[in-house]
Every structure is written in C-alpha cells, then in structure tokens.
Swiss-Prot record:
Induces host endoplasmic reticulum stress and consequently activates autophagy and NF-kappa-B signaling pathway. In turn, may induce autophagy-mediated STING1 degradation and innate immune evasion. Its main location: host cell. Keywords: Activation of host autophagy by virus, Coiled coil, Early protein, Host cytoplasm, Host-virus interaction. Induction: Expressed in the early phase of the viral replicative cycle. Residues 111-141 have a biased composition (Polar residues). One of its GO terms (cellular component) is host cell cytoplasm. It comes from the Viruses. GO terms for biological process: symbiont-mediated activation of host autophagy. Belongs to the asfivirus K205R family. Residues 10-75 form a coiled coil. This is Uncharacterized protein K205R.
C-alpha cells in the first residue's frame, strides 16, 4: 500500500502537472491570438498607408486640375474678349476683318498731304473704279486694357449713341468684366438677325 503521505505528494504533483498543461495551452492560445492580432494590425497599417497615399494622390490631382482650370479660364477670358471685340466691330462695319496684326500707331489715320488731289487710275475691264470701304484696325490685337478703357478704341469702333448706352448700363463695371458685359448686351440688343447669322457662320470656319 502507498502511504498516505506519499499519495498526497503524488496527487499534488499530478495536479500541478495538469495545471502546467492548462497554462501551457492557454499560453499557446494567447500566442496564436497575438500572432493573429499582429497580422491584422500589419494589414491595417498597410491599408492605412495605401489610403493615405491615395488621398495624397487625389489631392495632387485636384491641385493640378485646379491649376489647369485657372489656366483655361484665363485663356477663355482672353479669347472671349477678342471675340467680343470682333463682334462689336462687325456690328459697326457689317463685314469680318482681315486677320492682320496692327499696332495702335498704325491704326491712327495719317493726314493727307494734299486733300484737293484725288488719286486717279484708268478703269479696267470697263468697270468704274470705286473707293473701297476702309476697314478699321483689327481690335483682336489691342490689349485688354485698351479694349476696356481706350478712348481711341471707343471713338474708332463705337458710335456716340452706343457709347452713351454702354456708359449708362455698365457704369459699375470695369476692365475685362465690363468688356464682356458690353459685348453680351450689344449681341443681344444691337445685332440684327443677319449679323448674328454672319457671326455664327464665321465662327464655324
């Protein structure tokens, strides 16, 4: 027979072994959970880095798009100003202007050396010579400040009646903003259907 004292120690050792096995299993489970957590955390960090990079890329693209939009808007304003200036001249003269670059100095008429003399030339093909209609300077090559404020420009291309109407309608506007408003007003109120049709045909070419 086993002595009670020896049996007690055997039972105690057996219980300790069982507890150690339980602790070892718990430690294994904890390590597995830790490994799983670390993998999940690393995946989260990787996804976060990817998301942060995507956000930065989107921000860069947005800034690039904004810069491109500002460039397009600036170019559009300049082109619109040129078109409106051409429309104003077309309304006065009724014919499109040749695309010839001229300066303000060239645009000013030179005094005639002899107003009494007339230039004569022999008629050709039995047709009587006629004085050609003088085309004004192509306003497309005036600067924006000249379009909007030049007295020479206004006197050369706008009648006094139209100048008075525009001054009254758009006294609170200046610069390119006023030019656009004047052009739109003249297109809507001053252009005939025939002139509008002519402009649309010209812009299709």
């Amino acid at each position: 027979m086993v002595e009670p004292r020896e049996q007690f120690f055997q039972d105690l050792l057996s219980a300790v072994d069982q507890q150690m096995d339980t602790v070892k299993n718990d430690i294994k489970d904890i390590m597995k959970e830790k490994t799983s957590f670390m993998v999940s955390f690393e995946n989260f960090i990787e996804r976060y880095d990817t998301m942060e990079k995507n956000i930065q890329d989107l921000q860069n693209k947005y800034e690039e798009m904004a810069a491109n939009l500002m460039t397009v808007m600036t170019d559009t304003k300049i082109q619109l100003g040129a078109i409106i200036a051409q429309l104003e001249i077309l309304m006065i003269n009724g014919t499109p202007l040749p695309a010839k670059k001229t300066t303000i100095k060239e645009a000013m008429p030179l005094p005639s050396s002899n107003t009494n003399n007339e230039q004569t030339s022999p008629p050709t093909s039995g047709k009587t010579s006629e004085t050609p209609k003088k085309n004004p300077t192509n306003a497309m090559f005036f600067t924006r400040s000249e379009w909007a404020s030049s007295d020479t420009f206004r006197e050369k291309f706008l009648t006094p009646e139209i100048q008075a109407i525009l001054d009254e309608q758009f006294a609170n506007k200046t610069g390119i903003e006023r030019l656009h408003a004047e052009g739109l007003y003249m297109w809507r109120s001053q252009f005939s259907d025939e002139q509008k049709k002519m402009v649309k045909e010209m812009m299709k070419k």
